[in-house]
Amino acid sequence: TKHTILHTNDVHSRLDPFPIDGTKYQGLGGVTKRAALIKKIRTEEKNVLLFDCGDIVQGTPYFNMFGGTPEYEMMNAMKYDASTLGNHDFDTGIQKLADLQSLATFPMINCNYDLKNTPMNGLTVPHRVFVKDGLKIGVYGVGIDLKGLVTSKQTGELVYHDPIEMGNAAAAILKHEMKCDLVICISHLGYKYKENKVSDVIMAQNSKDVDIILGGHTHTFLDKPDLIKNKEGELVMINQVGWAGIRLGRLDITFEKGGKNSCVSCDNMWVRN
């Protein structure tokens, strides 16, 4: 069976396309074009999942004026299956984030933030299983260390835990206890850094049981997914599609009998007319 995974990251309240003004991204992005592209893919493909990798908000006057509500309403309308938390999602404080998440028709997935003593208590899940055409796809989410990115006033009593350790624990539950055929991490750690800071690449190298990492934070435009060997020598696929909704990531995965999966095509599509 064929399964199509679509994903965005770091959309940053970009509801409109970039203006036609001679700049680098002119005419690209915009929710209407993204929604049309997603709708077209859903009419062509039977098994589609749509994820976001954080930083839904912050970056345009829409957010300054309306506080994130339109962004969440648009994601609801596009029927996102899940998102994870980015640092900028805390910019107006954790109470406001909780208010926005209560509007969402999609789960917010994160396994390495302890939110029990915050307004976000009960508004996130560590992982989620999606069943499509008899196939179990397990998804967990990880977030970046928020220290230095947002203040403790904005995050409240959020407690950060190591994303590699928590991620491996979540992946093990999904793969071995819940018997998922495919395990995906939606991450807001960042693709990679010059310094030895936890990133998607470092997480992949230290991982077990995860097949695909969909990333965000570093606004990295990957033309094709990166393949990294995990600690057992198996390949983990990493993908990220820049920022601002300029691209829509697409991974088409074919599952063969016997549990082997192979990526038949990986297309990071430009969102344009």
Predicted regions and their residues:
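Acidic, metal/ion-coordinating pockets
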Residues: T1-R272
